[in-house]
Amino acid sequence: MYAIVKAGGHQEKVEVGDVILVNRLNAKKGDTVEFPAALVVDGSKVILGAKDLAKLTVKAEVVNDEAKGPKISIMKYKNKTGVARRKGHRQQLTLVKITAIA
């Protein structure tokens, strides 16, 4: 059984026991969070209707609330003028473990 969930502005394919990184959530380590399901597949049975999906949620436990993504360097450069600008960014993420699809 797996599900496609909406988590942090993205969609992720998850099964029970999976550990995924999502954009920063407002939750502490050990908290339980719920994600709405966009699609659930159970063997040959596919649940796709809005009424059926409203009854289903995917529960997850926060494993790490202080994870960070890779450092991304941005360089802006103007030719022949000596103008150069560097900037960096690291996305703040939350690590969650899927505990139930119900």
Curated annotation (Swiss-Prot):
Function noted in UniProt: This protein binds to 23S rRNA in the presence of protein L20.
GO MF annotation terms: rRNA binding; structural constituent of ribosome
Pfam families to which the protein is assigned, alphabetical: Ribosomal_L21p
Oligomer and partners: Part of the 50S ribosomal subunit. Contacts protein L20.
Iron-sulfur as UniProt keyword: no
Organism domain of life: Bacteria
Species whose genome carries this gene: Bifidobacterium adolescentis (strain ATCC 15703 / DSM 20083 / NCTC 11814 / E194a)
Name listed for the protein in its UniProt record: Large ribosomal subunit protein bL21
Keyword ATP-binding: no
Recorded family membership: Belongs to the bacterial ribosomal protein bL21 family.
